[in-house]
Amino acid sequence: MVKTVIVGAGAMGLSAAHYALRAGHEVDVVEADSRPGGMAAHFDFDGLSLERFYHFVCKADATTFALMKELGVADKMRWRATSMAYWVDGRIYRWGDPIALLRFPKLDPLSKFRTGLQMFLTTRRTSFDDLENVSTRQWIEAGSGRRVFDLLWRRLLALKFHQYADDVSAAWVATRIKRVGTSRRSMFQEELGYIEGGSDTLVAALVASIERQGGRIHLATPAQRIASEGGRVVGVQAGGRFFPAEAVISTVPTPYVSRLAPDLSETAKAAYDSIRNIGVVCVVHKLTRSVTPHFWLNIVDETMGIPGIVEFSNLRPTPEPIVYVPYYMPTDHAKFAASDESFVAESFGCLQRINPALADADRLASHVGRLRHAQPLCEPGFAAKIPPIRTAIAGLQIADTCFYYPEDRGVSESARLAKEVAQAIGTDYQPRRRPAFGR
């Protein structure tokens, strides 16, 4: 039995605690927030328990299904036929299946063929190594053509990554395409999943498992320092207390690592500091009527300041329509400091443009959530920038969402990597970053 402290009670931290306890270790989890779950946590939205940031499940998420089975909540998995679309030149066009592609009037036949072929081949990939040093722009232009990139991709990347738009890894984008593109009922019908009761069902089951196995979760207990002596971890200072430990797993965003683990070498700290992140301001609206019939609407419109909307109620049934409008941007962007009211007004104005039948009275409630480190910036060659999970300080492992690369953030990757780091406790094993689709 190894006395272990896990820093962070998000999906990865809670999963790591669950697996570590199953392996017979003693576990304390320290979390700065007053609630567990991280990005998967719920909040009370005008009487509805809802995720702070939207989540959905794909059929490739095998680790999620295995974890739910272990926790006794596999029966809470639900599947629903969904669709995505594009807003182009003031109109909505269905997207994501062969018929929709053939009917799309904004592309010539050759561009349609090249796009369909590139997307199809991407869903059949088992490795993304050849895309590691290629940008998304280079990859799309080479496969689908410049016209396709300019029409369907340029604006989306610009609004999510801003000045870094031309510096986004093709491997990262391709794995996202594969994950969603293989979650289908048939060639003509996308099918995505949700957990009944939302992600809080899984979070609550993890918390119950941890407590049942004798683990302890300390909320509102921010970690101040990971302490070491003689090159070995000895504990964590958190919330004014010291938690002795023979092993520590840090799951907090990499920008915090240098401050949290000052005993790391300057070279190691520089490696964590070099990983850039962008923030998000996520607006959620509760409405009296639906905006569109689609789950996901990409917006490529120079006159709109949003890259898309997620009509979550078109996946998980809710009493009233629920729409997420995410604004991704670097935290030093001037707009990040704008008021909640301005984001609510702008985003609802966009919804009214998409569906002119929406009146001001149709907005029942709105909520604005912010994260400073929501999305790692995965540039070409990003894999070489990611430090090893096991550090030079014996007993200390460090991983956050960027370690899922080329996979994107998600519960399934959180659980997969959490199992790896938990199995490595008390050993010299270096956990693998290899994602579900291989590298």
PLM regions: where:
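Internal hydrophobic alpha-helix adjacent to the cofactor/substrate pocket in enzyme cavities
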Residues: 414-433
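Conserved Rossmann-like nucleotide-cofactor binding loop
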Residues: 12, 35, 255
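Short FAD-binding loop at a beta-strand-to-alpha-helix junction that anchors the flavin cofactor
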Residues: 324, 388-407, 413, 417
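Glycine-rich FAD pyrophosphate-binding loop
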Residues: 21-45
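N-terminal Rossmann-like FAD-binding beta1-loop-alpha1 element of flavoenzymes
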Residues: 2-29
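Dinucleotide-binding Rossmann-like beta1-alpha1 core, especially the glycine-rich loop
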Residues: 46-128
